[in-house]
């Protein structure tokens, strides 16, 4: 069929800020879709509030709106842009839910909008669990036994359920939100009561639990005339009961019989055909022998779609977009080969393994995993065998266990970890095998298939042959199993880099194989490569190319913002006529799309794997500035292994001098640059004594970390003792620095060539200094930094550029207090704020940095902005019930949103995504004088103010009327907790107290705000900023270039 001619302008809705369950994979999907639609001559308008995405560049879409993803914004865009059609399938649950709302509110019909791809009616059937159940019955398929529990009569209805345990599910949810496995009726009643308090739906669904059955996924794609293929099937190592986003997943399935494979494939085709899917679709099955249940359908591109695309090389989102505008699978060429069509099912002659990356290194929370997602990102390993793919995925995780594999805990604890789904279960199984625990019991306790445990046994058996102090003679056999040099070195008691150096010297190197969707039957256009230890090498001629290291799995403090930099760097090299190589292990990202770079190496970002590529490919050099902390930490080691300088831009020597906080602070002192008073401590006792000498509060800062890991503002002696002991469990020295109270923190991004520099922009934190820059609410715009302070900043930047020979892009964090500028930190790399600054200024700063790296020259540019831009962070608090909401020096956010406006008030008001008519205020004594301004403004603007006794008395004494409410411990009514539950409160301002009773009360209130989705402010500066814009009504939604 020819493409549709009845539409010309298409609105693509993005997924918004990165949250758990909805991350970088949707930047990948939407970017592919936009490019695909533009190839066909359609004008593409893109809506997404996330500035860190590639899709919000004008190279991807014709018109870009970085605005709130709301009904109001979409209707404005439809009207302004005269939109013909909406593509909602590339923006995750956010976009799907929004288009369903647009349909129900009559906006789709009002403007005559066409929904391309899978119809809204099919989406509603897939997402509404009752409708989906009825649909399955109608086509002769089945889901688990189910009961619907209503809000009005849940206790009686629960009593009638004839089976336990059950799994609780909600409709239109993301990442398993609201889901839980419940074992008793009393437990279910308590959970239902809690759940109904936090959701708007009048019912929840209860299914018979299928925990323990094998879970399979089929990634399908179908066109409008009924052609349908299986892109791939995926097998979860973890059984049912663990969300597929939390499970280790292998592609293709390893343990299915041919009968089972085709039985599920036939069912998948029947389901997508019955639903009328037009585009991509993911179906999840629970397998019980030769019987099965249908668990769930995602009628859109998803996390699994991105994984399937990278596992097979089949560009699902790109193909789905073309299907959405009328093409059939038989008419669309596969862009990876150009010689085959999209109707050909991919064929794999290799194995991929995906492992999630959890944030438990940042959060001290419950590490068990289940039906709700907790992971932030994921990695994928590719190998010729399951063992090789698994071990490469483990190496890609970049956690301590990646490098040693062993878990040094008691036998009892090992069995607990094997038995209970958690982030360390795969390592506990390895440890059980090292201890010769029975395979049958390991299989029974973990419910892993015997096949996978026996493959892991192969790895353990080889490692057991290693001798301490000797490089193993069977090194090639170990490498064929994917066992990393890190694990071999640590097992043998030899520096892992010495193992890598030995291999390279003795030419024990891998070959590189191409992924082509067709098991090598056709030639590929763009090389997509993985390493393995075989004979035949398919490495293309890439001599003289420049390699960019990616940032690996998304994690707290290192996410989508760094992938943006990597992709823009590759694009810049291409513009300069320089061949580019991408090295990354993250299947969710745009950077690992097959045609972004001239050659893609899907490999772990480790000293070993990067050195292997450099040793074989004769590359011109390596750029590490766009890989977050990962590339910075391994740059010097790679050069030591290879015995040559390969890092381009700022040297690895300068990186080390900057990353070592003690050396850096001493150098600042010698240069006469102001910084907070500091001392260097080499043990816990020193840290305590030097902190007391400086005077509390202080901050303990470790070196070579990202996201302020393990940092806290320390106000009291007991906490000082506790943190000092904890921090020295992992490091040998820390910088003890005086905390600057009531200072304003700033982020300064700049590009330099070792002599000259160009400031990209200065972001001002609204909160006081002490909140991590990745979490802080920031603002950028005209004249927000005093002229005198700006001149001092420029002077400091110039000195740092020349002292450390900074070449490329860098980031300076500083604080302004009493008109003085104090340096906090320097990063000789791209920062989280570079995408934001690039979108706010309309200038490609990464391209300028790459030019400086490649030529040594720095073009002077002049940029200005007519608008103000607010950067607001998004947090994972709803996924971790035992996590406090208060912020500090250690980063907690998963993503960010940008809100632009022609005034500061408009920009800030857009960030508050609801009407505010009432506010609850409870602040500690130190903050009471500073809340007066905000409370007074809010009262003048007609807001109803509620406050706890102490705050209420303080406000009334100063002429601000408010209603007193009581804390939980006061045992009086009205209680603030009940009022929040009942919906009387629209905004909460609560600054944490330090005494135990108040801490417990405040924690419960803050957690309730998270559950109910109520805006929560824990900082007085932010409260003041909000108060000035709550009554602002002159809001408009504009194309991003109108602000430049």
From Swiss-Prot:
Residues 399-539 are annotated as: Oligomerization domain. Mg(2+) 4 binds at residues 825, 827. GO terms for molecular function: ATP binding; carbamoyl-phosphate synthase (ammonia) activity; carbamoyl-phosphate synthase (glutamine-hydrolyzing) activity; metal ion binding. Mg(2+) 2 binds at residues 296, 298. Keywords: Amino-acid biosynthesis, Arginine biosynthesis, ATP-binding, Ligase, Magnesium, Manganese, Metal-binding, Nucleotide-binding, Pyrimidine biosynthesis, Repeat. ATP 1 binds at residues 129, 169, 175-176, 208, 210, 215, 241-243, 284, 296. Pathway: Amino-acid biosynthesis; L-arginine biosynthesis; carbamoyl phosphate from bicarbonate: step 1/1; Pyrimidine metabolism; UMP biosynthesis via de novo pathway; (S)-dihydroorotate from bicarbonate: step 1/3. Residues 133-325, 665-854 form the ATP-grasp domain. Mn(2+) 2 binds at residues 296, 298. Residues 911-1044 form the MGS-like domain. Residues 916-1044 are annotated as: Allosteric domain. SUPFAM superfamilies: Carbamoyl phosphate synthetase, large subunit connection domain (SSF48108), Glutathione synthetase ATP-binding domain-like (SSF56059), Methylglyoxal synthase-like (SSF52335), PreATP-grasp domain (SSF52440). Residues 1-398 are annotated as: Carboxyphosphate synthetic domain. Binds 4 Mg(2+) or Mn(2+) ions per subunit. Belongs to the CarB family. This is Carbamoyl phosphate synthase large chain. The lineage of its organism: Archaea, Methanobacteriati, Thermoplasmatota, Thermoplasmata, Thermoplasmatales. The gene is carB.
């Amino acid at each position: 069929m020819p493409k549709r001619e009845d539409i010309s302008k298409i609105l693509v809705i993005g997924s918004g800020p990165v949250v758990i369950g909805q991350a970088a994979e949707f930047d990948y999907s939407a970017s592919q879709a936009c490019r695909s639609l533009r190839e066909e001559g359609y004008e593409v308008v893109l809506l997404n509030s996330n500035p860190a995405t590639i899709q919000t560049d004008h190279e991807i879409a014709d018109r870009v709106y970085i605005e709130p993803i709301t009904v109001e914004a979409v209707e404005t865009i439809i009207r302004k842009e005269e939109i013909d059609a909406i593509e909602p399938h590339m923006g995750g649950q956010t976009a799907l839910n929004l288009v369903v709302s647009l349909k129900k509110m009559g906006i789709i019909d009002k403007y005559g909008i066409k929904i391309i791809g899978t119809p809204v009616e099919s989406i509603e059937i897939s997402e509404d669990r009752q409708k989906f159940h009825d649909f399955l019955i109608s086509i002769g398929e089945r889901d688990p036994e189910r009961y619907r529990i209503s809000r009005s009569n849940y206790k009686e209805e629960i009593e009638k359920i004839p089976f336990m345990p059950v799994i609780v599910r909600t409709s239109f949810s993301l990442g398993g939100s609201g889901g839980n496995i419940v074992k008793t009726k009393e437990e279910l009643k308590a959970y239902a009561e809690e759940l109904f308090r936090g959701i708007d739906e009048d019912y929840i669904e209860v299914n018979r639990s299928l925990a323990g059955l094998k879970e399979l996924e089929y990634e399908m794609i179908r066109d409008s005339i009924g052609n349908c293929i299986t892109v791939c099937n995926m097998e979860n190592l973890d059984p049912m009961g663990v969300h597929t986003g939390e499970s280790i997943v292998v592609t293709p399935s390893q343990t299915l019989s041919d009968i089972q494979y085709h039985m599920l494939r036939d069912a998948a085709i029947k389901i997508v055909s019955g639903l009328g899917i037009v585009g991509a679709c993911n179906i999840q099955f629970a397998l019980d022998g030769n019987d099965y249940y249908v668990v769930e359908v995602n009628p859109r591109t998803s996390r699994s779609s991105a994984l399937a695309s990278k596992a097979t090389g089949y560009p699902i989102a790109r193909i789905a977009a073309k299907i959405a505008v009328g093409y059939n699978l038989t008419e669309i060429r596969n862009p990876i080969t150009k010689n085959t069509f999209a109707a050909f099912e991919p064929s794999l002659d290799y194995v991929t393994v995906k492992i999630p990356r959890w944030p438990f290194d940042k959060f001290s929370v419950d590490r068990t995993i289940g039906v709700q997602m907790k992971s932030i990102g994921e990695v994928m390993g590719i190998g010729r065998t399951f063992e090789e793919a698994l071990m490469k995925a483990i190496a890609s995780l970049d956690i301590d266990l990646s490098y040693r594999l062993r878990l040094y805990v008691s036998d009892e604890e090992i069995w607990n970890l094997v038995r209970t789904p958690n982030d360390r279960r795969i390592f506990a199984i390895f440890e059980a095998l090292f201890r010769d625990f029975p395979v049958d019991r390991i299989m029974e306790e973990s419910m892993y298939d015997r096949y996978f445990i026996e493959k892991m046994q192969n790895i353990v058996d080889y490692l057991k042959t290693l001798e301490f102090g000797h490089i193993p003679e069977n090194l090639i056999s170990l490498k064929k199993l994917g066992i990393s040099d890190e694990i071999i070195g640590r097992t043998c008691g030899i520096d892992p880099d010495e193992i890598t150096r030995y291999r390279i010297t003795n030419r024990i190197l891998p070959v590189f194989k191409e992924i082509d969707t067709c098991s090598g039957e056709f030639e590929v256009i763009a090389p997509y490569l993985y390493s393995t230890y075989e004979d035949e090498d398919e490495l293309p001629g890439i001599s003289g190319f420049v390699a960019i290291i990616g940032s690996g799995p998304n994690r707290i403090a290192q996410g989508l913002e760094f992938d943006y930099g990597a992709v823009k760097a590759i694009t810049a090299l291409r513009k300069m006529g320089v061949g580019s190589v991408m090295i990354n292990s993250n299947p969710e990202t745009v950077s690992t799309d097959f045609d972004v770079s001239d050659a893609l190496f899907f490999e772990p970002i480790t000293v070993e794997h990067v050195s292997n590529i450099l040793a074989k490919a004769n590359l011109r050099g390596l750029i590490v500035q766009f890989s977050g902390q990962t590339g910075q930490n391994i740059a010097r080691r790679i050069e030591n292994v290879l015995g040559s300088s390969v890092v381009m831009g700022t040297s690895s020597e300068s990186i080390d001098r900057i990353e070592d906080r003690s050396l850096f602070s001493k150098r600042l002192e010698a240069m006469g640059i102001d910084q907070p008073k500091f001392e260097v401590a080499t043990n816990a006792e020193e840290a305590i004594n030097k902190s007391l000498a400086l005077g509390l509060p202080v901050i303990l800062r470790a070196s070579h970390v990202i996201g302020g890991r393990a940092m806290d503002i320390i106000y009291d002696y007991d906490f000082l003792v506790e943190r000092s002991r904890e921090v020295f469990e992992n490091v040998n020295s820390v910088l003890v620095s005086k905390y600057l109270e009531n200072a304003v923190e700033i982020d300064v991004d700049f590009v330099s060539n070792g002599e000259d520099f160009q400031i990209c922009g200065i972001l001002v934190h609204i909160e006081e200094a002490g909140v991590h820059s990745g979490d802080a609410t920031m603002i950028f715009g005209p004249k927000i930094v005093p002229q005198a302070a700006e001149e001092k900043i420029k002077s400091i930047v110039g000195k740092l550029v020349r002292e450390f020979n900074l070449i490329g892009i860098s980031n300076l964090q500083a604080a302004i207090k009493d008109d003085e500028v104090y340096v906090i930190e320097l990063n000789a790399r791209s920062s989280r704020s570079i995408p934001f600054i690039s979108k706010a200024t309309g200038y490609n700063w990464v391209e300028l940095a790459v030019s400086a790296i490649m030529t040594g020259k720095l073009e002077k540019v002049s940029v200005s902005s007519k608008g103000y831009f607010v950067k607001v962070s998004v947090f994972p608090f709803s996924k971790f019930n035992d996590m406090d909401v208060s912020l500090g020096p250690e980063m907690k956010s998963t993503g960010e949103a940008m809100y632009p406006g022609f005034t500061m008030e408009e920009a800030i008001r857009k960030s508050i995504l609801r009407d505010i008519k009432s506010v609850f205020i409870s602040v500690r004594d130190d903050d009471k004088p500073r809340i007066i301004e905000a409370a007074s403004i809010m009262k003048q603007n007609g807001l109803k103010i509620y406050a706890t006794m102490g705050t209420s008395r303080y406000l009334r004494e100063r002429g601000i009327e408010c209603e007193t409410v009581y804390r939980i411990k006061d045992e009086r009514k009205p209680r603030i907790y009940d009022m929040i539950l009942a919906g009387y409160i629209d905004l909460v301002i609560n600054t944490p107290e330090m005494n135990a009773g108040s801490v417990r009360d405040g924690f419960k209130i803050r957690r309730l705000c998270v559950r109910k989705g109520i805006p929560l402010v824990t900082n007085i500066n932010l409260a003041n900023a909000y108060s000035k814009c709550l009554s602002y009504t002159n809001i408009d939604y504009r194309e991003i270039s109108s602000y430049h």
